[in-house]
Structure formats: C-alpha cells, structure tokens
Amino acid sequence: MEEITFAADPMRLMIAAAVGIIVLLVLIIKFKLHPVLSMMISAIIIGAGAGMPLTMISDTVEKGVGKTLQGIALLVGLGSMFGGILEVSGGAQRIAETLIDKFGQKKAGWALGLTGLVIGTTVFFEAGVVVLIPLAFSVAKQTKKSTLYYAIPLLSGLASGYAFVPPSAGSVLVANALGVNLGTMIMVGIPTALICMLVSGIIWGGFIGNKIFTELPANVGEIKDDGKELPSFGLVLGVILIPLVLILLSTLSKYMPLPAGVQDVLGFLGKPFLALTIATLAAMYFLGIRRGFSGAQLKKILDHSLRPVGMILLVIASGGVIRWMLQDSGLGNIIGPALEKSGLPLILIAFFIAILVRASVGSSIVAMTMASGIMATMPAVMDTSMLYRAAMCCAICGGATALSHVNDAGFWLVGTFLEIDEKTTLKSWTIMETLIGVTALIVSLVISIFA
C-alpha cells in the first residue's frame, strides 16, 4: 500500500503550525489540561488547519504513536525495572557511601555529584532524590555547612545523568527521534554530563553553598541506619556498567579488526533492549536473589518501578504524534531551508526550541519530545553525521533541563525536601538547572566542530 503524500500551502501550513503550538501552550499553562490531551488536540489542529484529509490525520496519529514508541517503550520499561532493583537493594546508597568515604568530607560534593550522575542514568530523578538526599544531609550535619553545599552537587549529578546518558528515558527518547545509536549517545553523553556536573554542581554548588546558609530540615534527626546490609561497591558498579559496556562494545566492534562472528555476537548483545534485559536479570540475581529477596518480593519491586512508565510513554507518544503531523504536512521541508538561510547552527535552533518549551510548559520530557520531533522533520538535520546529531541530542536535553521554575514539579520537590522557600530555590536549583543547559549547549557546539 502506497503511503499518502500531501502538500500543504506553505503559508496555511505555517499558520496552522503556529496556532497548534500556541493552543498547546495555552491548554497546558492556562487551563492546566494534561499534556497528553493537550498534545493530541494540538496535533489535530495542525493537521486540520493545514488542510490534510481527515483519513490522513487519523493515519498520522496512529503512525506517530507506533513509530515513536517502537524504539523506546521497551527500553524505558527495562530501564525503570533495572533502576527499581538498584534503588531497593541499597545499591545507590552503597555507591554514595563508598565515594564519600574515598573522597573524604572536604570533597564530599564530588562524591555526591558522581553518585548522582551514575544513579541518574538508571533511576527516575524523583526516586534518586528520595534515596540519596539523606546522605547529603548527613554530611552537612557533620560539617555544619549549608545543605546546599552538598545537595546541589547531588542534584546536578542526578539531573545530568538523567538528561544525557542512556539508558535514561530522556536521552533514549531524543536519540531515538534523531536516529542516533545509543553507543554514540553514551560516548558523547558521558563527557557532557561530567562537564555539566562540574560546572553546575561542584563550582556553582560550592559558591551558592557558601553564600546562602540553609539549615538541616527539621526531620533530619529522624534519618537513621535501618540496619540493612548493603551490597558491595564493586558488585553494584559492575551491574550498573553492564548495559553501558555492552552497548559501547557493540558500537566500537564495527571499527575493530575482529572476526565477523565475534562482531555479530557483540552487535547482538549490544542491542539496547538485550543489554538492558541482561542487566536487569543480573541485578535481579546479584542484588536480589543472592541477597535474600524472594521471587514475590522482586515481582513487587518490578511492578512498583513500572508505575510511572505508562504516563511517561503516553507523553512521549503524544509528542510523537505532533512530530509526525508536522512531518507529514510538509513543515520540515518549509522551515528547514528557511532556517538554513538564517545562518544559525542547527544545534542552536534545537536548544532554543527545547528551552522555550521547557520554560513555558515545565516538563522536561515534553520539551525533549517537542524539540527532537520538530528537528527530526527537517531534512537538513537527518543529512548530518551521527556525531553531529548526538551533539544535537545533548543540546536538546540541556535546553529541556534549563529554566526549571514554578511550573516544574522538580522545583517543588527540591524545595520541599530541602525545606527552603521559593526565592532560595530559584537562586540555587533554577540557576543550577540553567547552568546544565548552557554548559551542554557549549559542549555540543564544540563537539559539532569535529563532526
């Protein structure tokens, strides 16, 4: 069956797209309508406004959902299960405690930042905060320093790991939309995340922690050792590295003088879904069964870890519908040449789209979905090298992280846990998130020079 082609009047299409995006923002910001419904309404407005046949609009909606989820649904689910076991087993706590021991109190910010970065690649940001923030409070209590001095590096690491390094949902989503294999995304994402954590966590955390003294939360005295024996550091780190190593080996094996059979095996084992399946099974055995968890307990942990996944996938799918509606209506072929003539780097355009949506809507996932979807409709983007598109992924993820303020749930989560007012949260957390975005943009532009 031949795919329906459609050519809209350029002016009509531009107006329809503008109206659709404005309606999307108004529905979310003004009327507080759920992003999933808002994006579906916006997509239909764009298609109908552009004059697309009704049958084509419905076909595009179905195609948008299918094509968007086919490369990411399983990865997000597996990654969530993997992170759930890591969290409940005490693996995240072990990483933090060991690094704090090695670095010492004077460099505890580094230890917490690196812990956040490692854990942020595998667990949702909110879960990472709940599990690890007591450790930041513990160090602050011992040193009598501002809680911001230790909390900001930890939060920066969590945010950077989640934004840039697979198998986190955000990085996988953007890489999938722009056709970047996860091995390349990992190789670009890790140094980007490290630099962002250094600038926004260590440097900014030290500055703001010395400038603003924040007391320990009132209930910090209630945080006690629950007596649970934690898994060893080497075991936890080894399990965390399984998916990263397998995916990287798959990518690098193509450039190694290896027998064809070995390359095929490495390529197969490094398929993201299989690498994460192996990692999840390893986590279940080494961090679960061998440490006394029953099958029923593990099932309960996995079920609980999957609760947030459905909503995230619905948001991603709805954003994918807008992306395909824009693509099938021909918008990419219109704005692509216009943007090329503007002389602006494509990476800069991608960053600005992401940061505008993030500041307007508040959701980083919506911003990532929208920005990557819009950029993917432009033929000029898909003609660039894999490395360039990986750098663009980091710019998008950075833009979608920046400018967290009162319309972002993360803003209130951090303020509540640290027991600080909105003004202090803006001065510390919001600037930290924005520094992550700006630093990621600079790193992405530098990488693009060599792409």
Language-model region placement:
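Long, contiguous bundles of hydrophobic transmembrane helices that form the permeation core
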Residues: E2-M11, M187-K300
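Membrane-interfacial loop-to-helix junctions in multi-pass transporters
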Residues: M11-I15, L54, G66-I72, L99-L114, ...
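Hydrophobic core segments of alpha-helical transmembrane domains in multi-pass membrane transport
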Residues: A16-I28, M40-G49, V76-M81, G116-G120, ...
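Short helix-coil transition sites and intra-membrane helix breaks within transmembrane domains
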Residues: K30-P35, L69-A73, G83-Q93, I119-I133, ...
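Core transmembrane alpha-helical segments of multi-pass membrane transporters/permeases
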Residues: L37-M40, I44, T60-Q93, F268-G330
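Juxtamembrane helix-boundary/capping and inter-helix hinge elements in multi-pass membrane proteins
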Residues: A50, E87-A92, K102-K106, V139-Y150, ...
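Hydrophobic transmembrane alpha-helices that form the pore/transport pathway of multi-pass ion
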Residues: I100-V188, S360-G398
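Juxtamembrane and boundary regions of transmembrane helices in multi-pass small-molecule transporters
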Residues: K145, V180-K228, G398-A451
